[in-house]
From Swiss-Prot:
Family label: Belongs to the universal ribosomal protein uL3 family.
Species whose genome carries this gene: Prochlorococcus marinus (strain NATL1A)
The protein's name: Large ribosomal subunit protein uL3
Gene Ontology molecular functions: rRNA binding; structural constituent of ribosome
Gene: rplC
Subunit-structure text: Part of the 50S ribosomal subunit. Forms a cluster with proteins L14 and L19.
């Protein structure tokens, strides 16, 4: 299945494998999502499927979005995402996308917004080494030189300096699904994913899952 699913990060936990080793996992409440729009190459120039996630009260949604969802006969949904497909006619408008569409052991790419850290300094943002902390030192957490005077006489673009940290879209690739709970719409994936508990996640089948290398002769 080429479609992804939207979900909410619940937090992290751990599972134990057959050897008794603790494996860090992330719990994701994924779906159910509804197909809200089908796009085709004839009408839109490309084939895609749009899905919606998370019910929302009528007072919290604008009229254009309300009318868009009414065309597909869906309830009011907060989040909409679109996925490119080869043939959108294979899907049905209003159909549900659930965790049943994924398999245990499948690799997925998970996208989300990282936790915002606000305005951060050189050590926290870039991992710079600090200066001496002893008495008499005037350089504790300063960045050091940011450029020469006469030549070039300016700060080069891209120079790592203090500034806003976090709050960016990040994708963690090829995470393995270790467990699926269909009763509670849960995906349990190995490792960590971007964002804090409660943040929106986009889970898609992995684009790159690695290449197996044949050992020995043919």
């Amino acid at each position: 299945m080429s479609l992804g699913i939207l979900g909410k990060k619940l937090g992290m936990s751990q599972l134990f494998d057959d050897q008794g080793r603790a494996v860090p996992v992330t719990l994701i409440e994924a779906g159910p999502c509804r197909i809200t729009q089908l796009k085709s190459a004839d009408t839109d120039g490309y084939a895609a499927v749009q899905i919606g996630f998370q019910l929302i009260r009528e007072k919290l949604i604008n009229k254009p979005s309300k009318g868009h969802l009414a065309k597909s006969g869906n309830d009011l949904l907060r989040h909409l995402r679109e996925y490119r497909v080869e043939n959108s006619s294979e899907f049905e408008l209003g159909a549900s996308i659930t965790v049943d569409d994924f398999e245990k052991g499948q690799k997925v790419d998970v996208s989300g917004d990282t936790m915002g850290r606000g305005f951060a300094g050189y050590q926290k943002r870039h991992g710079f080494s600090r200066g001496p902390m002893s008495h008499g030192s005037k350089n504790h957490r300063l960045p050091g030189s940011i450029g020469a005077g006469t030549t070039p006489g300016r700060v080069y673009p891209g120079k790592r300096m203090a500034g806003r940290m976090g709050g960016k879209k990040v994708t963690t690739r090829a995470l393995e699904i270790l467990k699926i709970d269909t009763n509670h719409n849960l995906l349990v994936v190995k490792g960590s994913v971007p964002g804090k508990p409660g943040s929106l996640l986009n889970i898609r089948p992995a684009k790159r899952v690695g290449v197996s290398i044949q050992q020995g002769g043919e």
